[in-house]
């Protein structure tokens, strides 16, 4: 693992913003990582809901062939989407490195299941074209509360993975049921 990060990187993971300027009697703090997540959420909500590119992303997720037939440059939009995913992964990695004060390459190795479950809980479809930034945000919050609760109840990581996998399977069963 790589260690010895600068104070700026540590600030992303451990930094706090003092809120006494709001006139609060007690000293209240807001984590920098929470502020950063809120800023990213607002930017991406605007991007996905108020821009043409955001609408194209939904169209490509729903049916890439129809999107291509309607004149959308699918390959260009996919490059943009994958670039944004890489950028957001980098932000997440910086926050994680700041929290742990180390850059371990396998640190997020088991996070894929949580990410998929958060998206599914938030209403995103396995089949594309559906889902919202707000829904995914809600799914992430629910997953965080679920993980925290399971950790507080001292549930082993194996059974946590089983539970989260079951949530995904149940959502697939629910999606595939005829209406």
Predicted regions span which residues?
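Membrane-helix/interface signature in polytopic inner-membrane proteins
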Residues: 43-82
């Amino acid at each position: 693992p790589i260690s010895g990060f600068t104070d700026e990187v540590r600030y992303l993971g451990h930094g706090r913003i003092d809120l006494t300027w709001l006139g609060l009697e007690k000293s209240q703090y807001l984590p920098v990582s929470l502020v950063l997540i809120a800023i990213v959420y607002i930017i991406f909500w605007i991007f996905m809901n108020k821009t043409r590119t955001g609408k194209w992303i939904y169209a490509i997720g729903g049916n890439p062939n129809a999107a291509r037939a309607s004149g959308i440059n699918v390959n260009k939009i996919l490059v943009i989407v994958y670039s944004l995913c890489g950028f957001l992964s980098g932000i997440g990695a910086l926050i994680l490195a700041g929290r742990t004060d180390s850059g371990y390459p396998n640190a997020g190795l088991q996070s894929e299941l949580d990410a998929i479950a958060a998206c599914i809980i938030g209403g995103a479809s396995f089949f594309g074209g559906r889902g919202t930034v707000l829904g995914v945000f809600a799914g992430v919050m629910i997953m965080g509360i679920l993980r925290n609760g399971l950790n507080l109840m001292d549930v082993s990581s194996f059974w946590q993975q089983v539970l989260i996998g079951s949530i995904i399977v149940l959502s697939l069963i629910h999606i595939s049921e005829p209406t």
